[in-house]
């Protein structure tokens, strides 16, 4: 073994990448370049990978090689869940965790002065995701180096102090002398609740000489068996059958909540809250704002009473600065604080994720400023916030930006270190591009649409305005072409339904203004038509054109038509770059005797698992986002049939959640809600 290979082996020995896939095309070179960059201490690198080129597999190999705790950041829950599922399959023997917002529904507290309307915070917490968040922090604090956390931008939002979280853990070992009641007291400090009847997550049951702990961050039950005041055994049990899974000599029990504090810190916090309350009330009174002063005094006084009696109150996160002991204006603790200093950060779809990271702080402060100004909250509420972008950057160590169209920021941060990955394992090429005049563009488009319909393929049409999208949809429907449109006025559930009906063949054409959204990488789409492509602007710049054209990149007949009367700089750059990639892809296919093959859309995480059991090594094909249930038949169902379907969907949803297939579960839930709404209407 060469020295370099030995070095990589020793560094990555904590990670075990399990896959029958083998790096192909650009992947081996990309893996090597990114790995060497990390090893050499390069601060930032960019992986420019086209749709379907296997970027996730490349990143998995880099993680294995460098052997560091890794945070993978995605810009939405759905894509984060997909990445989590893929990483879980690649690293089944390592700690792969999922950290996103645990709200199924969240209405933030707000006040609208123009109408004197106060909106109370309203939320619904997803218990399963709460468990997974705790599992992520527990894994990071355990000292393990083989931890991968896939997260949304929730990772920059405030949470408990990791030092406090770590201080509260209870270490147990066989032979340890500890009174059973002392153990129960310490578990209570960790916010575990005693329940000797039925045991749920975060609860403790006592029966004779055994203490059963339903860990807040695990699906397993921990059983502590005593012999007098000595721990005789520590076992992990199946919670349903109570069958032993594993025995331990020692075990660390972590808190049942990310926000945990002790009595002393609570009393100190209350004193500081009272001091700040007096100052703010005096401030309002001097300004003649008696209503605001009275409102603030009543609200905060009530909160203090609740904290004293129960240890918490509604909106306690607005007092987090006091409990953390932070100075005014300082950043909150967040998930990044749980990582060691040498962690690796991977930002997926960085052209979208980075701007999102920029925007979080401003939006949060705008709402909080109004609440403070009108006496609903103390100024300290503004310190319960997401990180500023500058704070986020300061906390990062080494980063890999991943995108098919990296923005100027990523390229500048990478100082020109852009690793290219344009060869697809399937041999598929970038779509060919044609430029046609705008005169009679609709008639020309109609001919192209008819050809696609004959081949049972789908079409995406991009217009400049919502009105144009609606008018074109109406026209196409009038000619007998099954057409739908998507724009900002179409809500999320309706958008998902339309996309699925496009895939199912209910629609042949989808018209939209901005079809850059993730989840539109549909193998059935062979044609992308961009109307008025020469109108320079946000949706017609080089990056947007490249992203839009890429929607046809998963089809063997992929083609893009730009309707324009002139060639703009953005069009020229897009055409030149696409042609360059196509030449490289064609050359690779010819050299390796590869015939482009149509992508089979992977429908579920279960399909991925089934695929991974094949024995013949092959190239990794990046899965397209999950397919939603086809709903065309729903209109023909009776009410009773719909109720039966809802019951079936609920059962499947619960099964999917147990298998950690959260994308599947969410889709099944949405379909269930849609059918329920139809019954009620």
Feature-to-residue mapping (PLM):
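Acidic, low-complexity intrinsically disordered tails
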Residues: 7-14, 587-667, 672-681
């Amino acid at each position: 073994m060469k020295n370099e290979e030995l070095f990589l082996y020793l560094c990555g020995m904590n990670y075990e990448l399990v896959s029958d896939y083998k790096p192909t095309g650009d992947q081996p070179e990309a893996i090597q370049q990114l790995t060497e960059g990390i090893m050499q201490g390069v601060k930032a690198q960019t992986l420019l990978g086209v749709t379907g080129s296997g970027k996730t597999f490349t990143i998995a190999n880099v993680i294995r090689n460098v052997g560091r705790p890794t945070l993978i950041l995605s810009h939405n829950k759905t894509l984060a869940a997909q990445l989590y599922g893929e990483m879980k399959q690649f690293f089944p023997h390592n700690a792969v965790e999922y950290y996103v917002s645990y709200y199924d529904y969240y209405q933030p507290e707000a006040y609208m002065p123009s109408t004197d309307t106060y909106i109370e915070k309203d939320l619904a917490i997803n218990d399963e995701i709460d468990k997974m968040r705790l599992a992520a922090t527990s894994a990071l604090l355990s000292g393990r180096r083989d931890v991968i956390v896939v997260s949304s931008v929730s990772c920059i939002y405030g949470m408990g102090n990791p030092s406090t979280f770590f201080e509260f853990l209870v270490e147990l070992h066989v032979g340890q002398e500890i009174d059973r009641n002392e153990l129960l007291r310490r578990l209570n400090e960790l916010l575990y609740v005693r329940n000797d009847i039925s045991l749920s997550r975060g609860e403790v049951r006592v029966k004779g000489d055994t203490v059963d702990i339903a860990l807040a961050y695990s699906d397993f039950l921990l059983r502590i068996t005593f012999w007098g005041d000595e721990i005789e055994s520590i076992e992990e049990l199946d919670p349903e059958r109570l069958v032993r899974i594993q025995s331990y000599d020692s075990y660390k029990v972590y808190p049942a909540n990310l926000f945990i504090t002790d009595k002393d810190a609570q009393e100190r916090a209350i004193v500081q809250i009272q001091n700040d309350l007096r100052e703010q009330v005096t401030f309002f009174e001097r300004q003649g704002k008696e209503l605001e002063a009275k409102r603030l005094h009543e609200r905060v006084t009530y909160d203090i009473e609740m904290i004293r009696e129960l240890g918490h109150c509604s909106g306690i996160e607005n007092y987090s600065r006091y409990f953390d002991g932070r100075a005014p204006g300082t950043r909150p603790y967040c998930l990044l604080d749980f990582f060691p200093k040498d962690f690796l950060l991977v930002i997926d779809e960085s052209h979208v994720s980075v701007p999102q990271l920029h925007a979080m702080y401003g939006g949060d402060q705008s709402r909080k400023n109004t609440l403070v100004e009108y006496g609903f909250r103390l100024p300290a509420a503004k310190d319960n916030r997401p990180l500023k972008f500058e704070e986020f950057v300061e906390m990062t160590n080494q980063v890999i930006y991943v995108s098919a169209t990296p923005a100027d920021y990523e390229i500048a941060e990478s100082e020109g270190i852009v690793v290219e990955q344009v060869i697809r394992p399937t041999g598929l090429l970038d779509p060919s591009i044609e430029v046609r005049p705008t005169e009679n563009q609709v008639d020309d488009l109609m001919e192209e649409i008819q050809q696609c319909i004959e081949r049972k393929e789908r079409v995406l049409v991009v217009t400049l305005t919502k009105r144009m999208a609606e008018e074109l949809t109406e026209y196409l429907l009038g000619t007998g072409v099954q057409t739908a449109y998507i724009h900002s006025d179409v809500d999320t559930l309706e958008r998902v339904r339309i996309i699925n009906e496009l895939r199912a063949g209910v629609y042949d054409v989808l018209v939209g203004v901005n079809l850059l959204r993730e989840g539109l990488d549909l193998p059935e789409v062979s044609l992308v038509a961009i109307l008025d492509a020469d109108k320079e602007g946000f949706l017609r710049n080089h990056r947007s054109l490249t992203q839009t054209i890429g929607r046809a990149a998963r089809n063997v007949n992929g083609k893009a038509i730009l309707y324009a009367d002139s060639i703009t700089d953005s069009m020229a750059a897009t055409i030149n770059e696409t042609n360059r990639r196509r030449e490289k892809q064609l050359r690779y296919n010819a050299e390796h005797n590869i015939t482009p093959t149509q992508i089979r859309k992977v429908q579920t995480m279960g399909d991925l698992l089934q695929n991974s059991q094949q024995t013949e090594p092959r190239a990794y094909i990046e899965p397209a986002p999950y397919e939603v249930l086809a709903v065309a038949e729903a209109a023909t169902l009776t009410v009773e049939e719909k109720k039966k379907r809802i019951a079936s969907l609920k059962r499947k949803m619960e099964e999917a959640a147990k298998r950690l297939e959260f994308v599947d579960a969410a889709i099944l839930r949405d379909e269930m809600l849609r059918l329920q709404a139809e019954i009620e209407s």
